[in-house]
Amino acid sequence: GSYSGILNCKYDSTDSSLTYNGNLVSVPDSIQNIFTLLARVSRQSSDYLDTKWFPMDHEGTRHRARFLLADIEKVKIGNEDILCDHFRLDIEQSGEALIQVSPYDYFMDHVASAKALRQIWVEQTGKRRIVKASVSIYGMTVIAVLQDN
């Protein structure tokens, strides 16, 4: 896109605070964002993740997120059936907007929406790759599938 801007922030690990453009925001320990949650689901076991709530920040607003193991399914990639843990990802807003980190865009606006249904299929053995993901909102479903094993 054509956006360019300046980010001015400082994180202080001694008290877990973030100073952003002069605003002081306390940051809970081990806070997640959408990208660290995706990394977590590809690295940790379904037993560990299932139903556990994680503190989450999304675009300066506090949320909490959890993975719910929905099923174990085969996902076809090329000619191969890959056994996958099928998760639903719940995200709930738990606080007010503290800061606006960047201009809004469609993905970031809607990925944490309470109206979205988020699903992720993770390879059960081996690399624990995310082989399929879908987001449904406002009657539209977007699906991403790994093309080649």
Model-derived features: where do they sit?
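Acidic, serine/threonine-rich low-complexity disordered tracts
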Residues: 1-10, 49-149
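An acidic-aromatic
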Residues: 1-33
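Short, surface-exposed linear segments at secondary-structure transitions and domain or protein termini
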Residues: 15-21, 34-39, 75, 129
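Hydrophobic, aromatic-enriched interface-forming segments
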Residues: 22-70
